[in-house]
């Protein structure tokens, strides 16, 4: 009888292990987009592209949610965890504080955060060296400018967007030490990510000062910047996703930030406690050349930018990071 009892217990344990493994295998990953939504043609849409790629290749479904106000961040994260989603991806730095709280409450669930660092054993942090990619498009802007004046339009005024701006200015001045850079931020609240009208207004004000190339790191607000550039016959630079196709002929290039790869890889499996830093060397950022802008980028421009890219990867050019000490050291 003792032997039979042990056998029953063993079967029960094995059944539990198999059930847990099956539940884990069947768990659906989830992605929570931030303000602007998954069709913002920029940051969130890049995350959406990564999720869709995973879905297409795996043949499996995933969960997602588009927040419309700050309170929904924590609500959505907790709902996904309660539902058993795994892993759960928070897109954007603004989800950091709530995701840290929820991850502590659900220590057996796996999470990932993009554009922020959370030091927990069940959270993978994915950050980018935006200043390196911005350096390259800054060079491109200065080399393409006929007036010697280039512009920058940021979204919400936060250190992360200042990092874009600082890298852009460094690249522009590397290509042309005499270049003038005009810069504006759209606002100080999350609404700054989705205000195309304000983006257009800021771009037009820069054009009036002689700017003929403008880089927008502003989420959905950038759509207004790009349209203003097209209407004025100026050049614009996209961000996060490859936005060259939006206005062929006036989109000089895009500073591509591979949020799509970050989400795709996280869906395949997170590495809790790991901080994954993606720069030029890792293929996390770059500038985009395709059929929509190849006529705007001549061979000499590309040669100079590619040389700088190689030097950054080799460590010969050090691009200052605004977020290192909240200052732009040009």
Annotate each predicted stretch with a short phrase.
Residues 7-26:
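Gram-negative bacterial Sec-dependent N-terminal signal peptides
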Residues 27-330:
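A residue-level marker of the well-folded mature domains of exported/periplasmic proteins
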């Amino acid at each position: 009888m003792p032997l039979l009892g042990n056998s029953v217990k063993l079967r029960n344990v094995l059944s539990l292990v198999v059930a847990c493994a099956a539940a884990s295998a069947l768990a659906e990953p989830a992605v929570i987009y931030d303000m602007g939504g998954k069709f913002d043609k920029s940051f969130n849409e890049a995350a959406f592209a990564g999720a869709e790629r995973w879905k297409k290749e795996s043949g499996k479904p995933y969960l997602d949610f588009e927040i419309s106000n700050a309170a929904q961040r924590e609500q959505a994260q907790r709902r996904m965890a309660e539902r058993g989603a795994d892993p759960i991806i928070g897109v954007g730095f603004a989800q950091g504080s709530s995701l840290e709280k929820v991850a502590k409450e659900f220590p057996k669930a796996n999470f990932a955060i993009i554009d922020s660092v959370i030091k927990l054993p069940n959270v993978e942090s994915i950050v980018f060296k935006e200043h390196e990619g911005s350096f390259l498009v800054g060079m491109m802007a200065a080399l393409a400018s006929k007036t010697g004046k280039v512009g920058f339009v940021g979204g919400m005024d936060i250190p992360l967007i200042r990092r874009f701006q600082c890298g852009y200015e460094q690249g522009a001045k590397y290509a042309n030490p005499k270049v003038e850079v005009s810069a504006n931020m759209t606002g100080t609240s999350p609404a700054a990510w989705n205000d195309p009208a304000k983006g257009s207004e800021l771009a037009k004000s820069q054009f009036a000062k002689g700017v003929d190339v403008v880089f927008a790191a502003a989420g959905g607000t950038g759509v207004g910047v790009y349209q203003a550039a097209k209407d004025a016959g100026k050049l614009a630079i996209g961000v996060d996703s490859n936005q060259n196709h939006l206005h062929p002929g006036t989109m000089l290039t895009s500073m591509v930030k591979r949020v799509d790869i970050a989400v795709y890889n996280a869906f395949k499996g997170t590495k809790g406690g790991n901080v994954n830093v993606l720069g030029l060397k890792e293929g996390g950022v770059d500038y985009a050349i395709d059929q929509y802008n190849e006529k705007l980028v001549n061979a000499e421009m590309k040669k100079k930018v590619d040389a700088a890219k190689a030097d950054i990867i080799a460590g010969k050019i050090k691009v200052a990071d605004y977020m290192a000490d909240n200052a732009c050291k040009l």
